[in-house]
Amino acid sequence: AQSVGITEMATMLRDDLRALGFQEAEVVPTDGHPGVWGYYNAGAPRTLVVYMMYDVQPVEENWRVPPFAAQLVDTELGQVVMARGATNQKGPERAFLNALSSIIAVDGKLPVNVMVLAEGEEELGSPHYGQLVDRFEARLRTADGVFFPFNSQAPDGSIAMSLGVKGILYMELESRGGSWGGPTQAEIHGSYKAIVDAPAWRLTQALASMTSRDGNTIVIPDYYNGIRPPTPEEQRLINALAARGGDERGRASLGVERYIDGLSGRDVLVRQFYHPTLNINGISSGYAGEGVKTILPHRAVAKVDSRLPYGLSPDTALARIRRHLQANGFGDIIVRQLSGYPAAQMSVEAPIIQAALSVYRKYGITPTLAPRLAGSAPFYQFTERLGLPLLFSGLGYGTGAHAPNELMLVRPVAGSRVAGLAEIEKSYVDLLFALRSAAPASRR
């Protein structure tokens, strides 16, 4: 996400695909970070697209080990590889490539044709992934489904499998001194607040105008319009999830004592999957260091994201936000869209989903199925644009994505129900062979 090592990583992935015997493997330029394309022609009737990402989040302080050394560390769960990208997303992706290598070593070729389309900007909101899809669209449309290798197990070995993702609108809102007031060139002495407007106050007031006082309900006109309610299939999944309970467990995992508005049970799930959010990631203005410095800053900036349920597009959401600010006297607030894409949704009946469920049954696992993930990924490029079903799931446990000490479990302790690296790779082998005999994907 900081444009460090991008060319090296793209080249490494391309070379890995070539080493596996992919007949096509190339680094593909975009207007941003390059993508990587690979094609393995097994002469098979089924074709699988594999979505990959080779970029990672920045590293922070408080790491137990050097974040890019990929050291093995012993924990109470077993031996883990601890590194930035261990679980998000290089660990599962390398395990998948290892599975391909094993099949080729034993059988001489893969059971399905494989297309790899990787990006280096997922952590930036995938602003140029569409250019990669443009380049290979005709060939991608011939595929039967899409797979994103993913560590889905909890520490107890259970799996929560999601059938979709929310979309996202990521924005930067800025207030600067101008004709409305405030210093226009640079910060000034704080004593002048007696006679000069403050961009920092103006920005916070503009932000506050968009939600209820507690920040939990979006009050922008029409913002909830167009959101598709749960289908009958999704209602059944929600009811099954709610019947399992888990409010206390969920709060503990997030480190919170209560959900907003005192939500519990089924209401938590509906709110999480079917309501949009408006979240302030950070606000910066003026001086926030140690000691005392009295200034009136000339600008203030907020990073804001809105998670978008199925039916609310980023373009529509952005237009409604701008219209609201203008109507409420905040037309001077600068709104810059940094990234955005719509939601994606799959059916549990899709052949690739059914193939995954059959593999999990082989390992004695019955996944918990959720209509969608509350997070976001650019899967709409496949599900909505190309009409391809997509699976993002897999054996394996990891934690700490976007945080210090990110890890992926590779050798579980005795008696653990979590898959280690070898079992993860075996499950990917099983999935590829299950896909070989799966029914053709239906086209939307």
Protein language model regions, located:
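N-terminal helical capping/dimerization or prosegment-like subdomains
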Residues: 1-60, 299, 303, 316, ...
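Acidic-enriched catalytic cores of C-N bond-cleaving enzymes acting on peptides and small amides
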Residues: 154, 163-164, 168-170, 180-283, ...
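A short beta-alpha structural unit
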Residues: 306-309, 334-349, 372-373, 378
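Active-site metal-coordination/substrate-binding segment of hydrolases
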Residues: 45-118, 414-417
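Histidine/acidic-residue-rich, glycine-tolerant segments that coordinate divalent metal ions
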Residues: 111-195
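His/Asp/Glu-rich mid-to-C-terminal helical/loop segments that flank catalytic regions of hydrolases
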Residues: 190-216, 319-320, 358, 365-367, ...
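Active-site-adjacent substrate-binding region
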Residues: 207-211, 215, 240, 347-390, ...
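Short, solvent-exposed beta-strand/turn "edge" segments of beta-rich domains on protein surfaces
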Residues: 196, 290-298
